[in-house]
Amino acid sequence: MLAHLFSGIAKWAQDSSGALTILPDCATELPEGILNDDGTVTYTYTLKDGLTWSNGDPLKASDFVFAWNRAASAALGADYGYMFEVIKGYEDVANGVEGAKLAVEAPDDKTLVVTLANTISYWNELLAFPTYYPVHEATVASEAWATDPSTYVCNGPYTMSGWEHGSIITLTKNDSFHNAAEVTMPTIRCHLSDDSNNMLANFKNGTWLLIDDVPTNEIAALKTEYPDEFVVAGQIGTYYVCWNINERILPEDSTLEGVEAETAQAEIRRAISLLFDRNYIVNEIAQGGQVPASSFVAMGMTNPDGTQFYKTAHSTNDAFDGYYDVREEAFESNVDKALEVLAKYYK
């Protein structure tokens, strides 16, 4: 929803082939950074002409300076404040050092200069993330600004025109948006629900046009019933089971100490992990297109050279990628190995 209400330096958009890519939004272009002698990297952005807030105030480069320092500050304690750690000066700002500021400046109303602590390959991706959106300084001085459409000042393709708390948020096209000609839907009604059964019922009866969750037990049928509409979207993340066990998991009568004890406990933890049938979990329980995890770092996270991290994280001559062999045909062998380890320590 924030992407409808705010506009940042950059944005995600579809290119001519339909693939998602990052394009300039409030900025005229996304230039290459300049490498400084001390290893820092400086980027200079020029804002487009005529940018305004929804209340008519001009949008200035200083709005980004304020918003980024606010989001990174210890005083705000924002969940995503850490995303500014790539910018020089972040540690002092995050730790609440008096007078500390991020290395972000606005020499004039249309120029934004930011210096990163070092080279960052994903800098443009950060610029397109909602945490990097600007906020209207005078508006956010009131903590309640974001809970009422009458005080919700934004700069995106839509404004908030209605909010029935716990029910519906209504967005209306922002005619003063810098790219308003490309905004084709005059109104978006966002129904608030955390009930997947309710979501699906409203989609089926035509009340809602888009939903982002369905009951797990309906997935198989929906793939057949709505072959074009039902889409499983990728998401980078790892779900895991956390065992509530003591730090020392060796039997009480074990005589192992020091490095030997640590090595043994690592073997035991690995053995427990091998007992999980990951394929059964994703295919029979989750059913949402998840894939078995062979490392804690999810598929989709890449090394600087573009290779998948999980494939190189545990480089061995084994026939599988990652730390565990998660192929279906390997499960029986995994269990045998796990039981062998557990039998060695628990007799």
What residues fall within each predicted segment?
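A structural "hinge/loop" feature
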Residues: 1-3, 23-27, 123-133, 242, ...
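N-terminal lobe/hinge region of extracytoplasmic solute-binding protein
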Residues: 1-36, 153
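Gly/Pro-rich hinge or "lid" segments in bacterial periplasmic/extracellular proteins
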Residues: 14, 116-187, 197-198, 205
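Surface-exposed binding/hinge segments that line
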Residues: 44-46, 63-65, 76-137
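Extracellular/periplasmic solute-recognition and catalytic clefts
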Residues: 161-172, 189-252, 279, 283-285, ...
